[in-house]
Each structure stands twice: as structure tokens, then as C-alpha cells.
Design a protein with these regions (language model features):
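Eukaryotic intrinsically disordered, low-complexity regulatory linkers and tails enriched in Ser/Thr/Pro
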Residues: 1-118
Length: 118
């Protein structure tokens, strides 16, 4: 799965990077960041910025949930792709394939796109 930064400028493979969150106050305003790390960026690269720690945690949960769905779909589809191709209309198969490909990419949502129940 590919992980895209909030601003769309960074694209990393999820399986080869570790992600972490940090939060605190800057000029009396709470902020939270999500960073990715690997050998080529040991100090971390900022992927997203949120106005609260709760929103950053929610964004990380969204990422993990999407990754889990993809893994389940991969397990279900393995060995059945040929059967699906034969039993579905070409347009149906194309739409399913497009949805799967879109699931393979996670872009961190903007701050105002995350709702947190407190």
C-alpha cells in the first residue's frame, strides 16, 4: 500500500517505513504531527499535521483500518481472480479492479476532514 502525505508531496510504501505521531503545544496552540521514518530518513519526514492529538490518532486509525481491509481482500481474492474475470461483465470487473487499486493508496486527510467524538 502507498501512503501519501497530507499535501500530496510525499509518497511512501507503507511496508518499508515506520510511522509515528508526536504532539504538543506551539505558541499555546495544540498541534500533532505524523512522521515517517526509515534508514534514509532517520530524523523523520512530516506526512501530516493536525490541530489535536485526537485527530492525529484518528488519522492513524484510518490508515491501519484501510491496510487491514486490503490484507483481507488480498486473502479473499487470491486464486479467485480468474473466476471473477470469467463470471463478471467486463465493465463490472473493471469497476471492482478500480476500487481495489484506489484502496491501495491512503492519503492523510486534511484536519477539517476528520471528526472526533470527545
Amino acid at each position: 500500500m502507498r501512503v501519501i502525505s497530507q499535501d500530496g508531496t510525499i509518497d511512501v510504501p507503507y511496508d518499508y517505513f515506520s510511522l509515528s505521531m508526536s504532539s504538543g503545544k506551539y505558541k499555546d496552540v495544540e498541534v500533532a504531527y505524523i512522521y515517517c521514518y526509515n534508514l534514509s530518513s532517520p530524523n523523520g519526514t512530516k506526512l501530516a499535521e493536525y490541530s489535536t492529538e485526537a485527530k492525529a490518532i484518528k488519522a492513524m486509525e484510518m490508515l491501519r483500518e484501510q491496510y487491514a481491509r486490503i490484507e483481507i481482500i488480498k486473502a479473499l481474492v487470491s486464486g479467485t481472480c480468474k473466476h471473477m474475470e470469467e463470471s463478471l461483465e467486463p465493465e463490472e470487473f473493471k469497476n471492482i479492479l478500480k476500487k481495489y487499486i484506489n484502496m491501495e493508496v491512503f492519503r492523510f486527510p486534511q484536519d477539517d476532514e476528520i471528526e472526533v467524538v470527545e
